Amino acid sequence: MAIEVQPAVSPHLVVSDGAAAIDFYVKAFNAVELGRVPGPDGKLMHAALQINGSTVLLNDDFPEYNDGKSSTPIALGGTPVTIHLTVTDVDAKYQQALDAGATVVAPLEDQFWGDRYGVVRDPFGHHWSLGQPLREVSMEEIAEAMKHQQ
């Protein structure tokens, strides 16, 4: 029997404490844990969550498999990646993330591209943007609005 494959893009996050990260994502983003695989030393080798209808993978940091270097955003001094969640009721979802322990990177505001949008940093250094479309805006309108941004 053939396995049905659904093409997808799923972020795979490296965190300093996988169990705590799962707890945070459940509280902050209503994540559903799909499964976890602990290693012999108790560190999390692999976990799968569903957040906002998409799969997010994560594991504990394993410097011993990376030339002794940590690869968490905190150890690297930040992250160049932001994971975006398109949601309804963005004000409540943003506050939920803050209440769970996230910190503000960009405050929640109505944006020129038509979304109400903000960015938070989770306790593990990963950035999450939350946006709710409020109105349709053409690419031409966005380009024109960009001319007036500081």
Place the predicted regions along the sequence by residue.
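Vicinal oxygen chelate
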Residues: 1-12, 22-123, 131-150
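Short acidic-aromatic low-complexity motifs
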Residues: 15-19
